[in-house]
Structure formats: C-alpha cells, structure tokens
C-alpha cells in the first residue's frame, strides 16, 4: 500500500544536504520511503494531511531518560537535599531491596518510551536512575525493556548498567563511595550476556551496549 503524508514543513535531503520543503509530501510503501519533496503526481492508496506540522526523519536521543522520576531526583534537589536521596551506610550494609516490582518497572519503561516516540524520537540510548535498585540494572529488566521497545518500534542502544561501588551519605552528612567489587564483576558479566543475546534482535531494533554506571562508582579494573 502506497501512502502519502502532506505537511507544511517537510525535512528532506538534496545532494546530501538537508532541505526544508514547504507544503511538501512524503510517500512511503510498506516500510520503504520512496519520495520526499514538493509534489508527487502518481496515484496513492491513502493520503494523510498532517496540516501545519513538521514531518522529518526521526530524532536520535543519546540521553533518553527511560524512567519517570529521574529529573526529580537528579535535577531539582539542592546540594543539601540531594544528600538525603543517596543511600545511607546502614542501608548499604543492610537488607537492600528492589523498590519497584517487575510490573511497575515495565510501566515506567513503556511510559517513557511512548513519550520519546510522541516527541519524534525513533532512536534512543536509554538511561535511568539507580537509587531504587538493589544494586544496579539487571539482565531480566533489560530483556523486558527490549521487548517493549521492539513492540513500539523504537530503535534502542542499550545494556544493563554495572558498578563496583555506590554513593552513600554517612551519619556525619559527608558523602563517600562504598564498594562491593564482586557485584560489579557480576554485573559486567550480565551486561555481556545481554549484548551477546540481544544485539541485532527484533529485526535490528536492539543494539547491545556496555554501559558502566557513573565513573566514580567504577573501579579501574571494572572499566578495563
């Protein structure tokens, strides 16, 4: 089926350079774009008038927030309040837990991915916070994310994070990093397993990525 989309601004290319076509159109058949430009005289099966809209290639977001609390935790608190959002030393040494269930994690990812697509992003490198994790992101969590991304048609470069330490706020209010290098090594192995099993999956929508957490929470050995 051949489809024609018309709009006020069409972002295309001519001789390798970007060009804006005013009141232009995009023609595609199945999954292939066959024309971008001002006019198209051949018959089509369906015409969609997008009106006063920008029709462009999908955007690429290499800092794609794929949760719904990241900005609240990372951007808005001042230095003093931010200390209260880090783990305590007691929590680090105690019974840590996953705050969100698997179903809640899936909702957060799906909601975030849909928001990316609604804002024109078709290729994303997801990032998210780790305050609420038992340690870092997991293989199972990212396998679920990959399925959601593929279902929505979003191209993603992804892999579970891994780290050998975590920022904590001590009883005196000072911040430091506490270490568990065994968890860092285990996380790296999980990340490698994800890349091996998911890179190129779902028709190439999933691209595997080794994504260590913040550099101050990784040992030199883990990064190497």
Predicted feature residues:
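Alpha-helical packing segments of well-folded alpha/beta enzyme cores
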Residues: 105-112, 116, 145, 187, ...
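Residue-level "edge-of-site" marker
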Residues: 129-130, 162
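Metal-coordinating catalytic core of metallo-dependent amide/deamination hydrolases
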Residues: 135-224
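Active-site gating loops and adjacent loop-to-helix segments of metal-dependent hydrolytic enzymes
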Residues: 71-105, 134-137, 165-184
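Divalent metal-coordination and catalytic microenvironments
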Residues: 8, 26, 31, 52, ...
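Short acidic/polar active-site loop segments enriched in Thr and Asp
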Residues: 122-123, 155
């Amino acid at each position: 089926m051949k489809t024609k989309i018309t709009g006020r601004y069409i972002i295309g290319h001519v001789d390798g350079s970007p060009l804006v076509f005013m009141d232009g159109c995009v023609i595609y058949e199945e999954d292939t774009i066959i024309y971008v430009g001002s006019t198209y005289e051949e018959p089509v099966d369906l015409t969609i008038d997008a009106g006063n809209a920008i029709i462009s290639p999908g955007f690429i977001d290499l800092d794609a927030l794929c949760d719904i609390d990241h900005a609240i935790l990372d951007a808005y608190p001042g230095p003093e309040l931010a200390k209260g959002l880090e783990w305590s030393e007691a929590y680090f040494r105690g019974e840590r837990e996953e705050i969100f269930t698997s179903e809640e994690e899936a909702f957060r990812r799906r909601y975030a991915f849909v928001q990316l697509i609604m804002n024109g992003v078709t290729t994303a490198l997801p990032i998210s916070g780790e305050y609420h994790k038992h340690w870092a992101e997991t293989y199972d969590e990212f396998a679920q994310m990959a399925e959601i991304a593929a279902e929505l048609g979003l191209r993603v470069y992804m892999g579970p994070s891994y780290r050998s330490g975590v920022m904590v706020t001590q009883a005196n209010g000072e911040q430091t990093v506490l270490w568990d290098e065994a968890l860092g090594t285990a996380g790296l192995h999980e990340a490698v397993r994800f890349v091996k099993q998911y890179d190129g999956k779902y028709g190439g929508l999933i691209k595997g990525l080794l994504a260590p957490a913040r550099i101050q929470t990784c040992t030199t050995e883990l990064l190497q």
